């Protein structure tokens, strides 16, 4: 195989709400995640009406990057990161979301963080909305089901683009915008969009109306960003779990093809600038009444993205003659026809380990869209043990990352995919999004904090730290 591009961005990925802490400091308002309690594997997180005294909210303090950012960025620099993907906490900039003017203390915090990154030669890659909508917009406006929230988001995007136009080049509008396709789990519509579905509402219809507003908001933000700095690279970001047919039975093959439309819907609109015909047919068939305003077509057309960012953790498989009752089961990918793939193994959390699926995904996306791609999440969640000598041995994580880097290298050097970079998820241990746990760790830096919020917060390098440092130094030559 040939060499990786010299300017390939090896990095790490995080989200403000999962690692910053300082949830009510510097003028920050509460976000939709600040009312989410701790859960566990198989125990869903609760969304409370207010901040309740007897509940534990793990994101409030998280790993306290808010006060430790210099120390943490120094560790990222020691690892040799070329970029750091993180997000700007929306409610840090607009505490309620509907203010006319941004919160200066919040803006200054990100100035300090970006300056510190750039001082160490680390390029910031920034997500505008990573499950951090101001709680006020969700409670008072109904989140993105309300068209007014489009304007609030664009106002927030403009404030960020203007303030950081000389510090940030790579942006993404919404993180994993397609998570909310899973309407069976209320966590996703709430965190993606600040939306709660009423008892008598059609969840899918609510989701598509909400999605339309977000797609319009994304397109308006892209156009606004290009006005502010034409050099900006503004991308979309989706969660991607490729779906394989269980067999060569044509029914299985066609079912996988149909199910993949759920995966492609959002990027189809954000990359191409118009609704795919299969989606319009679905609205018609199901009788969904989605309100499109005059001019929306033009907005979508004029706000297409420059690149596609995506998360990849696993693949899933479907079989046409199977019907699952438990669509919440991760093994079947939450799909009614999902089955276990006999050719691949799974992690302790039931996530299929499939590096070839990453190469497959890169090829499918690149064939479909012909724009640069960016792997902005990938990684291995596991329970790690801090030894008495301060070491953490994580050979499974190294093996997982190694096999996935081999797959992406092949996609670039053999298949010819245009790939901007690779940012493994949770480069330092953070609060898990789905469960609120600390126990499920992705990092190459261990943080001494447990599920109940106890611990010294001290940072320790895992074995994977030195391993990844060498991968970056050799531009992926030595795995």
Swiss-Prot record:
Catalytic activity: 6-phospho-beta-D-glucosyl-(1->4)-D-glucose + H2O = D-glucose 6-phosphate + D-glucose
One Gene Ontology CC term in the entry: cytosol
Keyword Hydrolase: yes
Upregulating conditions: Up-regulated by the aryl-beta-D-glucoside salicin.
Keyword Hydrolase: yes
One of the record's GO molecular function terms: beta-glucosidase activity
Active site: 176, 377
Gene Ontology BP terms: carbohydrate catabolic process
Enzyme class: hydrolase
Top-level taxon in the UniProt lineage: Bacteria
InterPro entries: Glyco_hydro_1, Glyco_hydro_1_AS, Glyco_hydro_1_N_CS, Glycoside_hydrolase_SF
EC number: 3.2.1.86
Keywords, ordered alphabetically: Carbohydrate metabolism, Glycosidase, Hydrolase
Pfam families named among the record's database cross-references: Glyco_hydro_1
UniProt xrefs under SUPFAM superfamilies: (Trans)glycosidases (SSF51445)
Family: Belongs to the glycosyl hydrolase 1 family.
Function description: Catalyzes the hydrolysis of aryl-phospho-beta-D-glucosides such as 4-methylumbelliferyl-phospho-beta-D-glucopyranoside (MUG-P), phosphoarbutin and phosphosalicin. Plays a major role in the utilization of arbutin or salicin as the sole carbon source. BglA and BglH are the major proteins contributing to hydrolysis of MUG-P by extracts of late-exponential-phase or stationary-phase B.subtilis cells.
Name this polypeptide is given: Aryl-phospho-beta-D-glucosidase BglA
